[in-house]
Amino acid sequence: MKDGLIRGFMLTKKPSFTSPGEFTVYRNIVPSIAFISVVATLGIAGAVARGADNDRSGDFAAAASAGACGGLPSHDALRAALVDARGQANGGFNLDMWGAVVNRDGIVCAVAFTGSDRGRQWPGSRVIAAQKANTANAFSLPGLALSTANLWAAVQSGGSLYGLQHSNPVSTNVAYEGPASAFGQDDDPMVGQRIGGVNVFGGGLPLYNARKQLVGAIGVSGDTSCADHNIAWRTRARLALDFVPGGVSARGDDNINYQGIVSVPSLQADFSHPICKKAGVDEVSSISASLPPTRK
């Protein structure tokens, strides 16, 4: 477009002049007019491009509100379940939490936190929660559930999924878009958009409805990764989206397999996770082992 304007200006027939003064005016003013035209045109093109980006963002948000998140918890439902789960014994440091839900296409449907305001949780855990949800959705199937905790051992050097954690990066534009005052609210800027990302420690779980359909995933972050897993598990159960068809834990679901407890070699060891100890003490493995069973 810019080149066309310049060519058009250069090919314009030079007018006749009746005095040197008229030529001077032509020489000084016309290039300025051409420059202004180019700048204006580029500005319009930029505005159109920005409008297209805004339209795409609006399309995602409209899709979320129009049914793409149907069957998944609302912001209020997610927060209520998350608060209830966080209030139980989960190990860790009993910290406030972030939670996020994505649908099967990886679109964020809800983001919430348990504290009185967004600063009561680790600010960085908002994006981590969404990243965990994206991971659990991205690497689970209708017949096989994988929690983010199940991925830890497999992505270590020499593991069967080594390097997975570096694939599918977080969309930083989505992660940090919008006013911070909206973070964790029903209009969180991530809602209606794809966050991406791969996280390989505890806190992300796939979501299966009563028909055993894989409908998305939940991610929880804000404490030790083991506590995150336990809180995510209780939150999913509270939401009745835990009709898990099968998994790699000893009991055939997507529960965490703790290293040092599962036998070696075994499938569970291949998809295991370290115990989150405090001052060298294991206070969490017994909690994870006693989590409510998934629905059948």
Regions found by a protein language model. Give the residues of each.
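Bacterial N-terminal signal peptides
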Residues: 33-43
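Flexible, solvent-exposed loop/hinge segments and secondary-structure transition points
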Residues: 53-296
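Signal peptide processing junction and immediate N-terminal pro/mature segment
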Residues: 44-55
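Bacterial N-terminal signal peptides that target proteins for export
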Residues: 23-34
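Intrinsically disordered, low-complexity segments enriched in serine/proline and basic residues
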Residues: 1-8, 15-18
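Extended rod-forming repeat segments used as scaffolds/tethers
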Residues: 9-10, 35, 235
